[in-house]
Regions:
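Helix-start (N-cap) detector for alpha-helical repeat units in TPR-like alpha-solenoids
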Residues: 82-83, 132-133, 169, 205, ...
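Extreme N-terminal leader/anchor segments
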Residues: 1-78, 288-323
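Extended, hydrophobic/aromatic-rich amphipathic alpha-helical segments that build helical scaffolds
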Residues: 82-92, 275
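Fungal-biased detection of long, low-complexity, Ser/Thr-
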Residues: 236-323
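Short coil/linker segments at helix-helix boundaries
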Residues: 46-77, 90-130, 134-163, 170-200, ...
Length: 323
């Protein structure tokens, strides 16, 4: 991935910012690199209960902290700080996923290790009762259990998240992945979940983009299974009639109802999915508009699944679709 990033940066003059323009987050992540937790504490305190921004920052901080003991040092210094408990839970989840990735596909994950992360999530939920973030972390890690979890248990945790934020995007994304064919469901169950959530979302909510995220998940699953071989009937995956109709619906409901203004860091990851869908579908107006709206807040995912991210983005810069 690092080699791809370097190659992409040179090929189109683009850079990929893991923090998506959130400079305060960049500073806090640098503190983690040098072993300091105080900047992380101050950042999360300042973030408060802005759930989308908090989720964006917690996720990035957990990725940065997973290979260090900074979170443990913070917990030791301030054992009663609820933000430290929330970040520790997210970090444990990241560590378990990192271990699963290192072990390779089909290797399985030690159940005791998953249990540790689950208990950290539940402890964080107790420490900060109004915060949906620990519940999103919990919904993320439980899909690593072989066979998943009991549907009643999953539903109970899902309702805990929704009581705190009924339109919590990260929580919805994690449930979508749980219901995907890659994990504990099917393409059909994943799309049903995405479409139901999108249909219930208020105007201006990013939740309709769940349908485009589901389309990426299906593409990854089918492509991985094909192992480079052509897949019959898959050539229109991005631009068949339903895909385009749903893409335009997301574009209208999310961006049409959104308060005008620059894209914020906490919106950018999911907006990359919508821009990617428009570009893959060959929608000239929407693709160029979305790439322009993103500006420099380009994420590697999901572009990396369909080729060189910088080359794909570069072809749409300046309003010109790919030839």
């Amino acid at each position: 991935m690092a080699a791809l990033r370097r190659r992409s940066d040179r090929s189109a003059g683009l850079s990929f910012d893991a923090d998506l323009g959130d400079r305060a987050l960049t500073t806090a992540r640098h503190d983690i690199v040098i072993g300091r937790w105080q900047g992380v504490r101050d950042l999360l305190r300042a973030t408060g209960d802005h759930w989308p921004l908090r989720t964006h920052r917690i996720r990035a901080l957990a990725n940065a902290a997973a290979g260090s003991s900074v979170v443990e040092a913070w917990r030791a210094a301030e054992p009663d700080n609820p933000d430290a408990a929330v970040l520790r839970a997210a970090t444990e989840v990241t560590r378990v996923f990192n271990g699963a990735i290192a072990a390779g596909h089909g290797a399985g994950t030690d159940r005791d290790r998953i249990d540790v992360a689950v208990m950290a999530c539940l402890a964080a939920a107790d420490a900060r009762p109004g915060d949906p973030t620990p519940w999103a972390s919990l919904l993320t890690v439980v899909r690593l259990y072989e066979g998943g979890v009991a549907r009643s248990e999953l539903r109970a945790w899902w309702e805990e998240l929704r009581r705190r934020d009924p339109y919590h995007l990260e929580g919805h994304v994690q449930m979508l992945r749980y219901f995907s064919a890659r994990w504990h469901g099917t393409h059909g169950s994943m799309y049903d979940f995405a479409r139901d959530a999108a249909g219930a979302a208020p105007a201006g909510s990013p939740l309709p983009v769940l349908v485009q995220i589901a389309r990426v998940e299906e593409y990854r699953y089918v492509s991985d299974a094909a192992k480079g071989r052509p897949v019959r009937g898959f050539g229109q995956h991005w631009n068949h009639e339903l895909a385009v109709t749903e893409l335009l619906r997301t574009y209208d409901r999310w961006l049409g109802g959104r308060v005008p203004g620059p894209i914020r860091a906490e919106e950018a990851a999911e907006l990359n999915y919508l821009a990617h869908a428009a570009c893959c579908a060959g929608l000239t107006r929407e693709g160029a508009a979305l790439v322009g709206l993103l500006g420099e807040r380009i994420a590697l995912v999901p572009w990396v699944y369909t080729g060189d991210p910088a080359q794909q983005i570069g072809r749409w810069r300046g309003g010109a679709p790919p030839s």
